[in-house]
Structure formats: structure tokens, C-alpha cells
Amino acid sequence: MLELWKYTFLGIVQGLTEFLPVSSSGHLTVISKLMNLNLETETLKAFFALLHLATFFAVLFFTYKDVWKIISGVFKKNEQRTAWKMIALLLFATLPAVVVGLGFESQIDKAFSGIVFPALMLLVTAFFLILADRFNGNKKILDLTIYTALMIGLFQAVAILPGISRSGMTVFAALLFGLSREDSVRFSFLMSLPVTFGAGIIELSKVSTETPYAISGFIAAFFAGIVGLWLLKKFVLHGKLRGFAFYCIIVSLIVLSISGGI
């Protein structure tokens, strides 16, 4: 029963922190270490990937209108140009994360091995969240160019590191390039679909019989993810990301103190 609650708790943590700008990877790495989970490295990675797949479905549920508009637009003559531009923007925004994830897999794995590095990266996340509240553009997603989509994608690629928030970095980058707060959130959500789906599918085959409670984590991550998406949208629209920055700083200092990093 204790193991069940551990997996469920990790699912809730993943669902909330995947979208709240406080770094899901950092939280999962630190918390799993503190909980002393009896999982082999590959199995732990696979479980985390399964949680990413759960958050993919949460985003899909939350953005189904946008996703359906893009898909259906491909088959409607008067909407094809808009649909294909959206697809191109999302592809180029995803490309950097794919290159970094596949090209530096071993180095990234090492970053997940301890808790000091994620704690330090939480301070980086805090810095960008404080800056994000300073921007308030008026551009729409379709005003982006392939170049700006690629640049926003670079920020997403950096967030592969534990402790760097994907949602925080992508929302910051979108705001930096002039998107409105609402469209910054929308683009961040849509960008997460290929990344979370890819991470889940690639590692899903590694889930073993040693994780019998993985489904509880999956369900918890899905519902917590929906809550996290709703909360992020509200906080971004009201320009209140700074509160999450202070949270990241506090958590970072606590973890560094526990680990002896400071």
C-alpha cells in the first residue's frame, strides 16, 4: 500500500509541475531520491516517461479544440494555409528538443543522477520567471516566423535539463518574441504535445513488471495535469509568474541545504 501511495504521489507531482513553471523533472528527481524508491535507473526513467505520456493526454484534453482545428483545417481548402503554417511552426519549435534529447542522452542522464544540479537549475528557472512578467506582447501565434518558432524551441530544448521548467521557458520565450499572454500559453501547450508524446513512447517499452503501481501514477498525473494547465493559464494571463519564481528559489535553497550544496 505504501508503494501505491508513492507512485500516486509522484503522478500528482508530475501532473502539476509539468505545467506549473517549477520544473517537473527537477521535482521528480529530488523527490524520488528523498523517498528512496527501490527502482533501477532504467525502470525509474520508464516510469517518468509513462507520467509524461499521461500529461500528453492531459494537454490533448485541454487543447482538443486547437488540435482539431489544425487537423480538420488540413482538409478544408480555405483553412489549409493556416493549418499547415501551424504544423510547420510546431515542427520547428519541437526540432531543437529532439536534437538535444537524442544527441546528448548520456550527458542528460548524468544530470538526473543527483539532486544538487536540479536545485541549481531551479534558480535559473526562477530568473526567467521573474523576467517573464515584464513582457506583454500582442502578437498571435500565426504572426510567428519559422525562425522565431525555432528560437522558442531552443528554450524548450534547454528545459530537458532537470530543474529547468519547460512551461516556464517556453512561455518566457513566446512572450519575449512578442506573443500575447494568451497565445504564449496556447503555443506552450501545443509545443508540449510532440515532446511529451515522444518521451513517453520512446521509453514506454522499458516499463517492467517491477512497477505494478505505475497505472496509479498515470491516472494521478492525468488529472493533476489538467489542474496544472488551468492554473498556469490563469497565472500567466494575470502576470503572476513571479510567485512561482520565489517558490523555485525556496525549494532550491532547501534542497541545497539538505544535500550540503551550500
Swiss-Prot record:
Keywords: Antibiotic resistance, Cell inner membrane, Cell membrane, Cell shape, Cell wall biogenesis/degradation, Hydrolase, Membrane, Peptidoglycan synthesis, Transmembrane, Transmembrane helix. It is an enzyme of class 3 (hydrolase). Signal peptide: none annotated. It is a multi-pass membrane protein. It comes from the Bacteria. It holds the Pfam family BacA. GO terms for molecular function: undecaprenyl-diphosphatase activity. It is found in: Cell inner membrane. The chain crosses the membrane at residues 44-64, 84-104, 111-131, 144-164, 187-207, 212-232, 242-262. GO terms for cellular component: plasma membrane. Its EC number is 3.6.1.27. It catalyses: di-trans,octa-cis-undecaprenyl diphosphate + H2O = di-trans,octa-cis-undecaprenyl phosphate + phosphate + H(+). GO terms for biological process: cell wall organization; peptidoglycan biosynthetic process; regulation of cell shape; response to antibiotic. Belongs to the UppP family. Catalyzes the dephosphorylation of undecaprenyl diphosphate (UPP). Confers resistance to bacitracin. Bacitracin is thought to be involved in the inhibition of peptidoglycan synthesis by sequestering undecaprenyl diphosphate, thereby reducing the pool of lipid carrier available. HAMAP family: Undec_diphosphatase. This is Undecaprenyl-diphosphatase. It comes from Kosmotoga olearia (strain ATCC BAA-1733 / DSM 21960 / TBF 19.5.1). The lineage of its organism: Bacteria, Thermotogati, Thermotogota, Thermotogae, Kosmotogales.
